[in-house]
Regions:
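Bacterial N-terminal signal peptides
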Residues: 11-20
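N-terminal leader/linker segments that initiate helical-solenoid repeat arrays
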Residues: 25-96, 426-443, 452
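Solenoid-like repeat scaffolds
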Residues: 48-54, 78-88, 99-102, 112-121, ...
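Structural register within alpha-helical repeat arrays
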Residues: 64, 94-97, 130, 162, ...
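Residue at a conserved register position within TPR or TPR-like alpha-solenoid repeats
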Residues: 68, 101, 134, 166, ...
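Catalytic glycan-binding domains that act on GlcNAc-containing polysaccharides
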Residues: 95, 111-112, 116, 281, ...
């Protein structure tokens, strides 16, 4: 469905359009036809003409300056950008120069930009560049004190410079506190470490070196740990060497760990390395027993790190058919961060309910998870399983399912709606509120200018910073309106995800209906909603996305996979075209369809295989049973997937699928249960 949408007044103002153009129908020339219920791409020519205070020639000069700065040609960039002055294109050009060239610009230039544009997004990045330049140029103590007068350092080098300036003016205690804080809590390279030691070595105590030693181990930075250990003693060196052996999987950790004294062996970093060593060498029961020995208060200092170990050990124990011990490992957590606490209590409750048939005890854990949960996904999961536990005890579960069902954009919210027999998905439109003030924000003006210049990667950087900075849901929704107006699905989704993290969900903006070429969708061998669901999870609609493993484009295809699919669909293979949206989706949809076919129609197996590969899926079928045979609860099967990334991936794709069916087809029935049960052996 294609409709025209008049942009909100604040957006008109942000673009600098004359008020006369804001009358009904006056913007038809600016906004094109779009798919769904939001405007899509703004025509570049009209956008350039409409934005205030600069010409199309200025915009072109900005683009050329950006290219020059990215290429490292500061002189050319300056020659192009200087005539732009303080216009938005001029500000953007200088910002890009700071981003790309950093200390080459000099401290004075960077600090001047920070002073002149305190509201420009990415302040932390620019302060980092300024501090690096300040240190490189050995600025005077007066300049250093002035720069840090209202803000604390963001780099270890900046902290050292400030501490030295403090010492020069007699503020020895403040300087010492700052040095100790950065020494114990931040990782930095050996040359800077030596500068810290030269200037403040006498102020660093054994406890400060031990904190740095711990930070190196907990961050799995063996070099930092070894250097810190050498300042502590031979035993700590032995533990650091054992840590490196575990990180590098050299097989020599056992001998080193056996040499530790009982005192050091019972310190938190030693527990961490001993447990990780046991887990990585498949001594899972021993790892579980050691986890039970850590004092709760001690573990709580790094509760998140130790929860990761507990989660991995607990799931291994389930694979070994030891659910009682798995429960004890999960329930014994000392997690402090809310997401970790929620996951830990869910895991403990799920083991009790589904593996040990103890619904009353399970309910206590689900209650704890529900009490702590904040995000829609975690709230829906906790309350859904509260309902399952209540049912298992013969009690009315309706109120729990109703609570979960309110979060219709989530996997467990949809399962709750299906359990209640409800139709439709409650994905609301964005919140309303006064947002005209946004047009005055320099970051918004810069964003509109970057879109007019088709600098989308830079625009996304501003978008992400603004999404964390804007004060309320109405402002975030308005920002998403702007990115939607420019047809930037990746930016719109990024805003929605950040909004959800901030507990300010935006509803419909979280599921863009643009960003995928319609022609490629029309030729897909699988339902279009499925392609959207995978794309949203794979690349978040970024056509240029490239993973660390080499997967590319909207549907994140590995070149080898894409080559096979190209041969099968009868198109020439060109690895360079994998970032072309049409080409990528054509091959990606073919691959997805083939996976569904290979798994005899099973969606959950195909989704898992798309993420983790068919080989792993076949291993999981052997280990946990086949969810297609009707004897295995597919909900439990998904929860048994040992890879956290893949387990989360399957659930997110399935929830995306339901929403996109609703948006694309106006489908009211919820088919998530059918999707879980699809396929024949």
């Amino acid at each position: 469905m294609f409709i025209r949408v008049k942009p909100p007044t604040w957006l008109v103002l942000a673009l600098g359009l004359a008020p006369s153009l804001a009358c009904a129908g006056g913007l038809d020339g600016l906004f094109g036809l779009v798919s769904g219920n939001k405007t899509a791409a703004i025509s570049h020519a009209n956008a350039q003409a409409g934005i205030a205070n600069y010409s199309s020639a200025d915009l072109q000069a900005m683009k050329q300056a950006i290219a020059a700065y990215k290429a490292g040609d500061i002189a050319k960039g300056d020659a192009l950008s200087t005539p732009l002055g303080a216009s938005i294109p001029g500000v953007i050009s200088e910002w890009v120069a700071i981003r790309t060239q950093g200390i080459q610009l000099g401290f004075d230039r960077i600090s001047r930009f920070l002073a002149n544009y305190p509201d420009w997004p990415t302040q932390t990045m620019m302060r980092r560049r300024a501090e690096e330049a300040l240190v490189a140029e050995k600025q005077s103590h007066t300049v250093i004190r002035s720069f840090f007068a209202k803000q604390t350092p963001v780099t270890a080098g900046g902290a050292l410079a400030l501490a030295e300036a403090m010492t020069a003016t007699g503020q020895h205690a403040q300087a010492t506190d700052l040095i100790r804080q950065f020494w114990g809590n931040n990782l930095f390279k050996q040359d800077l470490e030596q500068k810290y030691l030269t200037s403040f070595g006498e102020s660093l105590r054994k406890i400060d070196h031990f904190k740095r030693f711990e930070r190196g181990i907990f961050s799995e930075d063996g070099d930092v740990a070894l250097r810190a250990a050498q300042r502590l003693g031979p035993e700590e060196v032995t533990l650091a060497k054992a840590a490196v052996a575990v990180f590098d999987k050299t097989g020599t950790a056992d001998k080193l760990l056996s040499a530790l004294s009982p005192k050091l062996a019972n310190e938190l970093p030693a527990y961490f390395i001993r447990i990780k060593n046991l887990r990585r060498t498949d001594r899972i029961t021993e790892a579980a027993n050691l986890l039970s020995q850590i004092p709760h208060g001690l573990e709580a200092r790094e509760g998140g790190l130790f929860w990761v170990e507990r989660r991995l050990v607990a799931r291994k124990l389930l694979d070994m058919n030891q659910p009682n011990l798995a429960y004890k490992v999960a329930a014994g957590h000392s997690a402090q961060a809310i997401p970790d606490k929620v996951e830990a209590d869910f895991t403990a409750g799920w083991i009790l309910l589904r593996m040990l048939n103890q619904p009353e005890q399970a309910q206590k854990h689900f209650d704890l998870a529900a009490k702590e949960a904040k995000t829609p996904i975690s709230v829906a999961r906790a309350t859904y399983w509260q309902g399952r536990a209540a049912e298992a005890m013969g009690r009315n579960a309706g109120s729990y399912y109703q609570h979960a069902a309110a979060h219709g954009g989530t996997y467990y919210g949809q399962l709750a709606r299906a359990r209640l027999g409800q139709s439709g998905l409650p994905i609301p439109n964005g919140p309303s509120g006064s947002v005209h003030h946004l047009a005055q924000r320099i970051g918004i003006q810069g964003l509109a200018t970057l879109y007019a210049a088709d600098e989308r990667s830079l625009a996304l950087t501003l978008v992400n910073d603004l999404a964390y900075a804007l004060p309320d849901a109405a402002s975030l929704d308005a920002l998403a309106d702007l990115t939607t107006a420019y047809g930037d699905a990746a930016a719109t989704l990024s805003i929605a995800k950040i909004a959800t993290q901030r507990n300010l969900p935006l509803g419909q903006h979280a599921f863009p209906l643009f960003g995928i070429p319609q022609q490629a969708l029309g030729n897909a061998p699988i339902e279009q909603a499925f392609v959207y669901a995978i794309t949203r999870q794979e690349s978040a609609f970024d056509p240029q996305a490239t993973s660390t493993s080499g997967a590319k484009g909207l549907m994140q295809l590995m070149p080898a996979t894409a080559k096979i699919e190209a041969q099968k669909v009868g198109v020439d293979f060109d690895a360079n075209r994998l970032t072309d949206p049409h080409y990528n989706v054509t091959l990606g949809a073919a691959h997805l369809g083939r996976l569904v076919e290979n798994f005899n129609g099973s969606y959950i197996l195909a989704i898992a295989a798309y993420n983790a590969g068919p080989g792993n899926v076949k291993k999981w079928i052997d280990a946990f049973g086949d969810p297609r045979d009707g004897k295995i609860d597919p909900i439990d099967w998904v929860e048994r997937i040992p890879f956290t990334e893949t387990r989360n991936y399957v659930q997110r794709v399935l929830e995306n699928l339901q929403v996109y069916r609703s948006k694309l087809n106006n489908q009211q029935s919820i088919l998530i249960v059918n999707d879980l049960q699809r396929g024949n052996r």
